Amino acid sequence: MSDDPRQALLQQVEAQRVAFINLQFTDILGMAKTVTLPAGELEDALGHGVWFDGSAIEGFARIVESDMYLVPDLTTYTLIPWDQHEGLATARLICNIHTPDGRPFAGDPRNVLAQVAGQAADLGYDFYVAPEIEFFLFKPDSDGHHAPIPHDHAGYFDVSTDQATLIRRQMVRALQDLGIVVEASHHEVAAGQHEIDLRHTRVIQAADQTVTTRLTVKAIAQLNALYATFMPKPIAGVNGSGMHLHQSLTDRVTGQNAFADPSDPYGLSATARHFIAGLLEHARGMCAVLAPLVNSYKRLVPGFEAPVHISWGRTNRSALVRVPRVTTGRSQSTRVELRCPDPACNPYLAYAVMLAAGLDGIKRKLPLREAAEEDLFHVDPRARGLATLPISLGEALNALRQDELIQQALGPIIYERFLDARQLEWESYRTHVSTWEVSNYLTIF
């Protein structure tokens, strides 16, 4: 095998009988995009990149500045386990986006995350994230159309009554083949709802793995005549799908968990407490990025194990930030869990803003308020002095407009174009007359 990484990859592609290479990136809204090359074109792509029209991608560029090119990240090479035919394989490379002058594109979500991760590195930290990714599996209706029809009627941790357990195992095996470490998978609370938990890893790799998991889940579901959705609240009256994000900082010199202090009642270091304070400080401002859809705010309501109040605690699952217990002697596992994100978010942007918020808490040494351990769904938040998360996408966008730190983390290109895209969605929803309104008002007024 060659010592040159590019030549080594080309040799690997040939040895694995790869016929096609998918070059993958995401748009500002987090949708995966792919350009497929015959394997014979890979050498040129590695040497010179692959040009594309950025004006055709959501939020990327105006027509007058549209030329961009993809630069494959060689460390992301993997075979796609479900896409092999007649002894020939398809592989995938995740790409960074560059402008014609060779610079990283400021509107590339992966680049935005790299910039914020670099700020953490400058402070002496590596940022680790472990997502818990929830989703629904639905079966088509009698006409073969997509409909929110759960494929089973099991509940939390249940052994499903149909093929769901086998399908989850297929998903986990595919993720393992893709090099992703899955810590657990199980049925969630609602019928047809499932969760896959990934092992913590450095933040850019964690975001890559989150996108890959969404694609894998959808592909395996389709192979089983089902469809998977990461829509936060596809069915009224039941739990929605969240993406709880476990996170920690590691000291780059010692390799020790910077959040851990076994002498603290919560096991938290001063660094961890400042980090949590930063998350709480910017919770409203970053909510539009973490919960980016109109539908997201139908999940963030009382009574369905989703956070509403801006608070933290240990046993309290109604809190926005939770500090999970760790086994005695395993302080390296100390972490905090942010519970408002949902799986429809762009993970590159979501992980960037929450890291920026936490680092702001560290830099400013923000004090952490008292923990809230009671069930906040049944208390008056005003009596506790607790603020609440936005109750709509419109309110979340206004909060984003007022949070300069989150705007800076996104950068001016992504901030402006993300805001424009989501504002259009909000205005479309706000002016839409729903079936509920017609059925409740038409014959009465």
Model regions and ranges:
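Glycine-rich, acidic/polar active-site loops that bind/position phosphate-bearing ligands
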Residues: 1-445
